[in-house]
Amino acid sequence: MHILTAGVDEAGRGPLVGSVFAAAVILPETFDLPGLTDSKKLSEKKRDALAEMIKNQAVEWHVAAASPEEIASLNILHATMLAMKRAVDGLAVRPEKIFIDGNRIPEHLNIPAEAVVKGDSKIIEISAASVLAKTARDAEMYALAQRHPQYGFDKHKGYGTKQHLEALEKYGVLPEHRRDFAPVRNLLAQQALF
């Protein structure tokens, strides 16, 4: 008998701006998508195409996030765990087991769960969750780029690249920036001195 398993993964722990996203995905027993692997190993075009196929074929899926304010008040690790719990809680179909990418399990899931290091390359449900979390995170960055094109969010996706750091210096900190992350915090501290 097929056990309903969910894979859970996150996207956006490292960037200086925006939410951290998590996805939970339950796939059918017969699911097969050639080329599905860790989202970081896929081109954006391939990831977007796979995301649509996953959404269409999954038994159930849900994407959730924790905001920059929650990241600041909880810290990035706890905000990531919160986003993961929200993703699992948002599933309309309850899995019997959960596989989570990494080495930590969110508290209070009330479902048997196992952390799998590099799970996004080993377990297809985690690979699928990785793709959905990453495409949701990228969509947030494209929306932010529409509102603030001078920051280049569509190119660097919020990571602390040279372009992003220079834009931060030149244009300042946005409400969506993570104030507890060192480059943003340091810039705010410098501005407070003048």
Swiss-Prot record:
Superkingdom per UniProt: Bacteria
GO biological process: DNA replication, removal of RNA primer; mismatch repair
MF (Gene Ontology): manganese ion binding; RNA binding; RNA-DNA hybrid ribonuclease activity
UniProt-listed InterPro entries: RNase_HII, RNase_HII/HIII, RNase_HII/HIII_dom, RNaseH-like_sf, RNaseH_sf
Chain ranges of the RNase H type-2 domain: 3-193
Cofactor info, note text: Manganese or magnesium. Binds 1 divalent metal ion per monomer in the absence of substrate. May bind a second metal ion after substrate binding.
Reaction equation(s) it catalyzes: Endonucleolytic cleavage to 5'-phosphomonoester
Chief place of localization: cytoplasm
One GO term describing the cellular component: ribonuclease H2 complex
Compartment annotation: Cytoplasm
Keywords: Cytoplasm, Endonuclease, Hydrolase, Manganese, Metal-binding, Nuclease
Record: residues binding a divalent metal cation: D9, E10, D101
Keyword Hydrolase: yes
Cofactor(s) named in the record: Mn(2+); Mg(2+)
Documented EC number(s): 3.1.26.4
Gene3D superfamilies assigned to the protein according to its UniProt record, in alphabetical order: Ribonuclease H-like superfamily/Ribonuclease H
Keyword DNA-binding: no
Task performed by this protein: Endonuclease that specifically degrades the RNA of RNA-DNA hybrids.
Family under the similarity heading: Belongs to the RNase HII family.
Descriptive protein name: Ribonuclease HII
Gene name for this UniProt entry: rnhB
